[in-house]
From Swiss-Prot:
Keywords: Amino-acid biosynthesis, Aromatic amino acid biosynthesis, Decarboxylase, Lyase, Tryptophan biosynthesis. Disulfide bonds: none annotated. SUPFAM superfamilies: Ribulose-phoshate binding barrel. This is Indole-3-glycerol phosphate synthase. Belongs to the TrpC family. GO terms for molecular function: indole-3-glycerol-phosphate synthase activity; phosphoribosylanthranilate isomerase activity. InterPro entries: Aldolase_TIM, Indole-3-glycerol_P_synth, Indole-3-glycerol_P_synth_dom, Indole-3-GlycerolPSynthase_CS, RibuloseP-bd_barrel. It comes from the Bacteria. It catalyses: 1-(2-carboxyphenylamino)-1-deoxy-D-ribulose 5-phosphate + H(+) = (1S,2R)-1-C-(indol-3-yl)glycerol 3-phosphate + CO2 + H2O.
Amino acid sequence: MILERIVTDNLPDLERRKMRLPLAKLQELVLDIPYPPIDMAMKLKGRQVRLIAEVKKASPSKGIIRSDFDPVDIAGIYARNGASAISVLTEEHHFMGSLDNLKKIRESGVASKLPLLRKDFIHDPYQVYESRLYGADAILLIVAMLSPERLQELLSLSHKLGMKCLVEVHTRSELEIALESNARIIGLNNRDLHTFKIDLTVTERLRPLIPPECIVVSESGIQTRADISRLEELGVDAVLVGEALTASVDIAAKMRELL
């Protein structure tokens, strides 16, 4: 299973980071951050569907998506062309991301008014704290890889630190767990993380089950304006798009096409 392999492959890296920067010291550094996170929920509300544009170099299914990959340059293009938030993949082994990319984007100022979402396979409170330290305003939590108890723990910690959570589901049972945890930003992933197959009807099936007070984000497999129009008709608030943008020769032109 791809999801399980990704989590396993990253465990040694997490342990090394804990050795280099112990949790107690990490917590001190986070508490000293002078500025609050940007509210991603506020950025995703509106009459028109919002775009979360993803900084993504590679994926397990496609390999390297963009060889001339400059995360700061890409984030700047997103910020100038209508993105409401920027997702930054930080998983190293399968997506060729890094926490340093997140930090560089935040410190560069190219997207100073947009929330940054750390997209990774987060399962440990340590990762929540380090997300804040490296400049994230929000984090991804994947229900498929978390117990209900751990999901609630990570949600509570994130909110304590002022960060929002995009809680990702793929099935009805996962959605029920997310709603029971009082998640307010629900990501409907059209990709099965166990097989990496795409099915856009996932959003169609699950969207009617989500109460109106939640913000709904459709993720994965979104390639065209027609895809977004279809999702808009289903009542989603935002879409998360990665490969369709980073694979484009002209990212700005692709954004104009989608929006």
